[in-house]
Amino acid sequence: EIAGAIIMGTGHQPAFILNIIMKLVQNEIKKVGYDATTDFVRNLSFGQYNKKFKPNRTKMDWLCANEDQLDEYMNDNLCRKDISAGLFYDLLNSMKKCGLSNTYENWNKQMPVLLISGNEDPVGDHTKGIQTLYKKMKQEKLNIQIKIIQNSRHDLLHEASALETIHMI
């Protein structure tokens, strides 16, 4: 039995938006294949996340403000910098399933759940998306808490506030 859950660096997108993006990605998969990476998929997936962090040093500045950690990530050949069309489609499909009305039916309502996000995380829409998810989970009567880490982006465990985050968890 699961004793608790920590959901970090997430957000919420309405199903109709996910459906539109999924259709676009399906068309891209038909053209280039499931495993292909393209500028189109990059822009649809994470390409817009850097907008609020200009001037950009890298295409992944949205991950964290800690430049040393970001450089380490960018120089790591095992880290894939671009998402394939197929993986992005699967991610969107999973996000869509998380938004279904029956998603939380079988959850243990007593199990503690912590939503945690950086206030500058574009995945959580700079707290708007994670706040929406929190309200949705609260309506389902889940034992939910939310923590927003200030001056932090997506990768909370590599930010200057990492120790604070770890202690909170």
Segments and roles (model prediction):
Residues 73, 134-155:
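Catalytic histidine neighborhood in serine/cysteine hydrolases
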Residues 122-132:
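Conserved alpha/beta-hydrolase "acid-adjacent" motif
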